Every structure is written in structure tokens, then in C-alpha cells.
Design a protein with these regions (language model features):
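Intrinsically disordered, low-complexity terminal tails and inter-domain linkers enriched
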Residues: 189-229
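Active-site- and interface-proximal helix/loop "cap" or "latch" segments in soluble metabolic
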Residues: 180-183, 302, 306-348
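Flexible, glycine/charged-enriched surface loops at secondary-structure junctions
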Residues: 112-120, 246-261, 336-340
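A conserved active-site cap/scaffold subdomain adjacent to cofactor or substrate pockets
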Residues: 158, 167-192, 224-252
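N-terminal lobe of the biotin/lipoate ligase/transferase fold
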Residues: 1-95, 211-214
């Protein structure tokens, strides 16, 4: 596996680079660590206008970009750290998320954090979501990526993202802000807890016995020394990089010719209105359903009882070609039960 940094906080460029590596650097496996500044990233199958607070996006000059993977909308700023695994797999579409999530959870747990998976595509710490992940497949290769909320402006995320009231009701939460958390804050709590527990042990036993009881000897103190008093994101970046590249990993640079191709993908795809907003559809009928795999919605235009146009949206993840499914509906008579059955089949 080789390591690549984007050296950019431009979301349109970063997603273009990711796509280029997935589709063209097929000779090896890659790890990327990167950041986007002041950006909403929309899932591939989502209705952009339904996911953003358009007034706030304009007011705060927020970038909006659609990624190539499924899942839900997320806010990125320079308090986030994003990671991507791009690997060759013999049976790519059967690769479970856990293969890629495990090393991230392992690294977080080494810091004393109670990290675990929640559902199919979230990482939580003490009930707070700190990461959402997604993946897609391309000719025997897998792109798996996720965002780690380290010190994000959560109030900004809450303001610029629009959450469907049905989703909030289903999850039993009141807002984006109430269900996500920052690793830095949770890490501070964990470090303090480790210090208290270590001090209590030392008061009762010898220092050696206390260290043995802690599992990772004095891990809290070690991380305070490594991260510094401010627990900065650059220190967390360096820590995560060291954990994920512990077995030795060559850092790779793209050639000028390759970088020109990345710019071409950025300009012609990710930095266009058509890609980021163009899937939206004014509808006569909206059918919406929630399954364990996520939310799915069909927006349908009718002409004399027949389907004139259709779009399928959602925060689910699927390798199926939604465009082909949408096209297959055009010209058919509209029957509610058939649409509901189709939506169920899409997310299976």
C-alpha cells in the first residue's frame, strides 16, 4: 500500500484526485489523508436541495459537492480529517465495511476512546457519531472513505445542513448538533479519566502494578505528551498516519501529467452545477420509505397517469445503477404499490 496526500483543501479537487487514483492507479493499493474547507458533501443518490440550508450556504459561502459514493450529507471544515482506502479486491462488491473501519477504530481505542461501529456506516464514541463512511466499487477495486470529526464547528454543521424531520424522528434526536461529537472533546475527557484512574491506582499499588492494570501503560500521559496541551489536529493527523502506516508505507506523488488529468476531472465533473445540483426534480408524487439500509425516496412526474420522469434519492448505499432504474420507469402506468416494491428492492 502507498500513501498519498492531496496538499489541497479544495473539495472539488480532492474528490477528483480520489476518483483518478481509483480508476487509473490500478497497480497498487492506496491510503489518503485529506481535508476539505467549509464544504457540504452530498451522497451520490441524494437530492441536494433537500439536504442543504440554501440561505446559509450562500451566507457562509459554503462549497457544495456531490461525491461518488452513497450515504448521507456531511459538513467538512478544517476541524475534520478525511481518509480514503483504495484497494484491489478479488470480489470487490462483497467487501464489508468492517475491513476498513477496523484500523480506524483500533487507532481511536488506543487513545482510550470507546470507539465502535453503529449501523452500517457510522463510528460512534460514547453514543456520539464521530465518523460516517461510504464505499463504492470500480472494476475490481474498492474506494472506502470516511470523515473523522476532530474539532469541527458543529454549530455551523447544524446550520448549513437540512435534516428531514422524518429522519430526526426516526433517530430520536433533535438536530444534527445533538447526535454528533468531536473526537478532541471526547479525547480530553478520556485523557482526564485515564489520569484519574492512574492516580487512584498509584495511591493503592506500586507504579508497576498500576501500569499493568491500565493495559496500555500510562497511555493517557503518553498521548498528552505526544499531542501537546492543545491536542491539535495536526498532532492527531500525525498519530493516525503513524498508526495506519505502521507496517511501512511508501509516500507517492502524482506526475504532472496525472495532475493535469485530475484537474480535468475536477473541472468537467465535480466543479459543475450539473453534477452537484442537476439531479433534483420537481415532482407530482413523492414516495418515501425507511429501511435498515437507510432512507429512500422516489420523486415522480406524471402525464395522464403515466410516469413522465422519475428520480430516486436516499442516504442508502448500493452498487445498483439508479439511472437505469429511473429510465425503466418512464412510460409506465403509475401504481403506488409497484413503486413501493421497487424502492424496497433498490435498497436490498
Amino acid at each position: 500500500m502507498k500513501y498519498i496526500e492531496t496538499y489541497s483543501t479544495n473539495p472539488y479537487y480532492n474528490l477528483a484526485l480520489e476518483q483518478y487514483i481509483l480508476e487509473n492507479r490500478t497497480d497498487d493499493d492506496y491510503l489518503m489523508l485529506w481535508q476539505n474547507d467549509n464544504t457540504i458533501v452530498i451522497g451520490r443518490n441524494q437530492n441536494t436541495y433537500a439536504e442543504i440550508n440554501a440561505d446559509a450556504v450562500v451566507r457562509y459561502k459554503v462549497n457544495v459537492v456531490r461525491r461518488g459514493t452513497g450515504g448521507g450529507a456531511v459538513y467538512h471544515d478544517l476541524g475534520n480529517l478525511n481518509y480514503s482506502f483504495i484497494t484491489r479486491e478479488a470480489d470487490a462488491e462483497k467487501i464489508a465495511f468492517e475491513k476498513f473501519v477496523y484500523p480506524i477504530i483500533k487507532a481511536l481505542r488506543k487513545l482510550g476512546l470507546n470507539a465502535e461501529t453503529s449501523g452500517r456506516n457510522d463510528i460512534i464514541i460514547d453514543g456520539c457519531k464521530v465518523s460516517g463512511v461510504a464505499q463504492r466499487y470500480y472494476q475490481g477495486r474498492v474506494l472506502h472513505h470516511g470523515t473523522l470529526l476532530y474539532n469541527e464547528n458543529l454549530d455551523m454543521a447544524n446550520e448549513v445542513l437540512h435534516v428531514d424531520p422524518d429522519k430526526i424522528k426516526a433517530k430520536g434526536v433533535k438536530s444534527v448538533r445533538s447526535r454528533i461529537g468531536n473526537i478532541r472533546e471526547l479525547l480530553s475527557i478520556a485523557l482526564i479519566k485515564n489520569e484519574i484512574e492512574a492516580s487512584a491506582d498509584i495511591a493503592q499499588k506500586t507504579a508497576d502494578e498500576a501500569a499493568g492494570k491500565l493495559g496500555n501503560p500510562a497511555e493517557g500521559r503518553k498521548m498528552i505528551e505526544q499531542f501537546g496541551a492543545d491536542l491539535s489536529l495536526p498532532a492527531f493527523w500525525a498519530y493516525l498516519k503513524s498508526e495506519l502506516t505502521a507496517d511501512g508505507m511508501q509516500q507517492e506523488q502524482l506526475t504532472p501529467e496525472e495532475l493535469a488529468q485530475v484537474e480535468k476531472i475536477k473541472t468537467e465533473k465535480y466543479d459543475t452545477w450539473e453534477w452537484n445540483y442537476g439531479r433534483s426534480l420537481e415532482a407530482d408524487i413523492v414516495r418515501k420509505a425507511h429501511y435498515p439500509q437507510g432512507w429512500i425516496e422516489a420523486r415522480i412526474q406524471l402525464d395522464h397517469g403515466r410516469i413522465k420522469d422519475a428520480r430516486i434519492y436516499g442516504d442508502f448505499m448500493t452498487p445498483k445503477d439508479l439511472t437505469q432504474i429511473e429510465q425503466s420507469l418512464i412510460g409506465r402506468e403509475y401504481h403506488e404499490e409497484e413503486i413501493d416494491k421497487l424502492l424496497e428492492d433498490v435498497v436490498k
